[in-house]
Amino acid sequence: MSNNSKRKGNEGERLARKLLQDCGYLVVKSGGSLSEVDIVAIGNNDVRGIQVKVSSDSRMFQPAKLEAVRETLYDLPRPPSFSYEIWIRYKKKGDRKWYWHQEV
């Protein structure tokens, strides 16, 4: 992974953490860059394991690409009130939107 990719990924994770903290979640960043989830958000009634992706390439949204990530998350243990989610930040000049793919 290039330094630029790491930088964009870290920026995406930072923005996701801020958004969740603003919604009242306690947010913990996963220790390793190769773990299944990037951040864990703990709320009053739920816990969310989130894989954050940042892309300027619309191909990231193709079903086959997302399915590979979904399959990894789908097989993980799932305690009550725990959800796995994929958050994608589409970062293209003039278009910086979050696209949510929840409940894997």
Predicted regions and their residues:
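Active-site-adjacent loop/helix micro-motif of nuclease/hydrolase catalytic cores
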Residues: S56-V69
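Active-site metal-binding core of divalent-cation-utilizing nuclease and nuclease-like domains
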Residues: D22-E36, V40-N44
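Domain-level recognition of nuclease-like catalytic cores that cleave nucleotide substrates
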Residues: R7, R78-V104
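Conserved catalytic cores of phosphodiester-cleaving nucleases, focusing on short active-site segments
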Residues: L20, I39-A41, N45-D57
